[in-house]
Amino acid sequence: MNNRIGDNLFHFGANEELLRALLEEGVKLVVIGGLAIAWHCPERQADDMDLLVEPTVENSARIAKTLTKLQIAGFSSTSFSKPGLQIPLKHIYYAELLTPQQEAPSFSEVEAKAVDAKLFNLPIRLASISTLIGMKKRAIQSATEQLEKHAKDIELLEKISS
């Protein structure tokens, strides 16, 4: 099943409630990840809904207010104002809220390149192809560094286990 039908994306049904509530509260966000890729490449089946949110105190307060209305507790008005956050909302929704990594393009840069799209027939901003390529390249680099670190750890442990 494709996530894109015409000029509209569809996804896990409960995510519509989350997205609608965030947009109604005026949360600044850009759809990223597999769902954004599915917009550009309809053959791509998306997994969860990844939303990049602007990491400002004002936007963070709007996010916290929205989550409280949706019965998701534990977030303060500054919870989403830090870089590099990845907050899964997987108990009720199949989504994650993320803030840009320190070394990655800022929210403003991602938003400036974003394209207009629809998700659940709601107007949204969606990451551009060039932004998504950059994000995927950073993910590969990070994974490669982690693999190298683990390989070195195994090598060190094997030396002392002989």
Model-derived regions: residue spans:
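Compositionally biased terminal segments of proteins
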Residues: 1-162
